[in-house]
Regions:
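Signature of the chorismate-utilizing enzyme
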Residues: 1-210
Length: 210
């Protein structure tokens, strides 16, 4: 990483490719998901079109931008964090400006750098920022997921299902590449059990849902 540019985080990709005949997206994700605090697996639902027949895995988050409860929160690779004041009038224009300002803080170059973007989701509740639709806003003690969150990952793995190819892209240099390759070769995969605690409940009553 080079921060010679004021307020800009500059990275250059390190890339490696291999045949994916011995790997599956789920199998690779299970081997890599514990490398960082956040990881994602996004699989394509279209295996017939070569342009869309891809799956992506992101691990080792570097930065993120999230929208929740009228606030926009940004975190950066140097540990800095910004949180906007609560704004009941937060709209699509404000969010677009925040995303543009966030993206301008990063300069990523090198082979396959087009894959080093933001990965995340926009939830159904985010409709409140784009349309005149009221959404019940509740803060939960657990699993209080943002309405919108997108993350820049240090490491991206791209499965090209049409050509049976796996491309590994890292912003962590050769050391990052070696770490990923070592994790890929692990024979054992740690699994975690889960069970429900208590009875199912909903924040919306049957009448409200109707």
């Amino acid at each position: 990483m080079d921060n010679s540019k004021t307020n800009t985080f500059a990275y250059t990709t390190t890339v490696s490719s291999m045949l994916a005949d011995l790997h599956t997206p789920v199998g690779v994700y299970l081997r890599l998901r514990d490398l960082g605090a956040v990881s994602v697996l996004m699989e394509s639902s279209d295996y017939h079109d070569k342009d869309n027949s891809r799956s992506f895995i992101g691990v080792n988050p570097l930065a993120s931008i999230a929208v929740a409860h009228g606030r926009i929160e940004c975190s950066y690779p140097d540990g800095t964090r910004t949180v906007s004041s609560p704004d009941e009038q937060l709209d699509s224009s404000c969010i677009a400006d925040a995303f543009n300002a966030f993206l301008q803080r990063f300069d990523i170059t090198g082979e396959q750098s087009n894959h080093c973007g933001l990965y995340g989701y926009t939830s159904f509740n985010a409709v409140r920022y784009f349309e005149q639709i009221e959404v019940k806003d509740e803060t939960q003690s657990k699993n209080d997921a943002p309405d919108i969150v997108y993350t820049l990952f240090r490491d991206i793995l791209v499965f090209d299902h049409f050509n049976n190819k796996l491309t590994i892209i890292t912003l962590g240099g050769q050391a990052g590449m070696d770490e990923l390759r070592k994790a890929l070769m692990r024979q054992s995969v740690q699994t975690f059990g889960f069970k429900a605690v208590g009875s199912p409940s909903s924040t919306v009553s049957d009448e409200e849902f109707r």
